[in-house]
C-alpha cells in the first residue's frame, strides 16, 4: 500500500487492562466513526502495517479497542502512541461544496484581488464553523505569519479547485 494513500484518523493510547486492550484517540468528526473505516493501518517504525480490529467499546468516557493478535499488556504497550491510518478510498464521496480536511491542507489561498495569502497548514474546528489556518508566504506584504480564515462556503470561500490546489476567498489580506 502506498503511504500517500493513507490518512491518519487517530492514535492508539495507553493500555487498558492485561488482555491487550488499548485506549483510542479518534480525530474523526464523531469519535466512534473511527471504527467504521476499515481496515486500519498502524504506522510502526515509519511503515504502515495492516491491523485487524477485533472488538471495541465505550469505557467510562473513553473508547477502547482490542486488535487481533494483541493479547497481553506487553504487546499492547508496544503500540502506545502509534498512529492509526486508513486508505483514502474508504472515505465516502462528499456532496458539492463539502471537503475533507486532508484535501484542503496544502492548498494555496488567493483572495479576490489576486493576492496569494499563503498555504493551508491545518484546519481548526470551532463551535460555529471550520477555520482555515493559512501559513503566510515568507515575504508577506502585510507582515503576517499566519491567517485564520473561516471556511464559510459561498460567503468567504468562493471557490475550491482541488486539481490546482487553490482556494479563492473573499478576505482582506490585511486581516
Swiss-Prot record:
<dbReference type="InterPro" id="IPR011033">
    <property type="entry name" value="PRC_barrel-like_sf"/>
</dbReference>
<dbReference type="GO" id="GO:0005737">
    <property type="term" value="C:cytoplasm"/>
</dbReference>
<protein>
    <recommendedName>
        <fullName>Ribosome maturation factor RimM</fullName>
    </recommendedName>
</protein>
<dbReference type="GO" id="GO:0042274">
    <property type="term" value="P:ribosomal small subunit biogenesis"/>
</dbReference>
<feature type="domain" description="PRC barrel">
    <location>
        <begin position="96"/>
        <end position="175"/>
    </location>
</feature>
<dbReference type="GO" id="GO:0005840">
    <property type="term" value="C:ribosome"/>
</dbReference>
<keyword id="KW-0143">Chaperone</keyword>
<keyword id="KW-0690">Ribosome biogenesis</keyword>
<dbReference type="InterPro" id="IPR002676">
    <property type="entry name" value="RimM_N"/>
</dbReference>
<dbReference type="Pfam" id="PF24986">
    <property type="entry name" value="PRC_RimM"/>
</dbReference>
<dbReference type="InterPro" id="IPR036976">
    <property type="entry name" value="RimM_N_sf"/>
</dbReference>
<dbReference type="GO" id="GO:0006364">
    <property type="term" value="P:rRNA processing"/>
</dbReference>
<dbReference type="InterPro" id="IPR056792">
    <property type="entry name" value="PRC_RimM"/>
</dbReference>
<dbReference type="InterPro" id="IPR011961">
    <property type="entry name" value="RimM"/>
</dbReference>
<keyword id="KW-0698">rRNA processing</keyword>
<dbReference type="GO" id="GO:0043022">
    <property type="term" value="F:ribosome binding"/>
</dbReference>
<comment type="similarity">
    <text>Belongs to the RimM family.</text>
</comment>
<dbReference type="Pfam" id="PF01782">
    <property type="entry name" value="RimM"/>
</dbReference>
<dbReference type="InterPro" id="IPR009000">
    <property type="entry name" value="Transl_B-barrel_sf"/>
</dbReference>
<keyword id="KW-0963">Cytoplasm</keyword>
<comment type="function">
    <text>An accessory protein needed during the final step in the assembly of 30S ribosomal subunit, possibly for assembly of the head region. Essential for efficient processing of 16S rRNA. May be needed both before and after RbfA during the maturation of 16S rRNA. It has affinity for free ribosomal 30S subunits but not for 70S ribosomes.</text>
</comment>
<comment type="subunit">
    <text>Binds ribosomal protein uS19.</text>
</comment>
Amino acid at each position: 500500500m502506498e503511504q500517500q494513500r493513507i490518512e491518519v484518523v487517530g492514535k492508539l493510547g495507553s493500555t487498558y487492562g492485561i488482555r491487550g486492550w488499548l485506549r483510542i484517540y479518534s480525530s474523526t468528526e464523531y469519535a466512534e466513526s473511527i471504527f467504521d473505516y476499515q481496515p486500519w493501518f498502524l504506522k510502526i517504525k515509519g511503515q504502515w502495517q495492516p491491523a485487524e480490529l477485533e472488538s471495541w467499546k465505550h469505557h467510562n468516557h473513553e473508547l477502547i479497542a482490542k486488535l487481533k493478535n494483541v493479547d497481553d499488556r506487553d504487546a499492547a504497550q508496544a503500540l502506545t502512541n502509534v498512529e492509526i491510518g486508513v486508505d483514502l478510498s474508504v472515505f465516502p464521496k462528499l456532496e458539492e461544496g463539502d471537503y475533507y480536511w486532508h484535501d484542503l491542507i496544502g492548498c494555496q489561498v488567493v483572495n479576490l484581488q489576486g493576492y496569494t495569502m499563503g498555504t493551508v497548514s491545518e484546519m481548526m474546528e470551532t463551535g460555529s464553523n471550520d477555520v482555515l489556518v493559512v501559513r503566510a508566504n515568507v515575504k508577506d506584504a502585510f507582515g503576517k505569519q499566519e491567517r485564520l480564515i473561516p471556511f464559510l462556503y459561498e460567503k468567504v470561500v468562493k471557490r475550491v479547485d482541488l486539481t490546482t490546489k487553490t482556494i479563492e476567498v473573499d478576505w482582506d489580506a490585511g486581516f
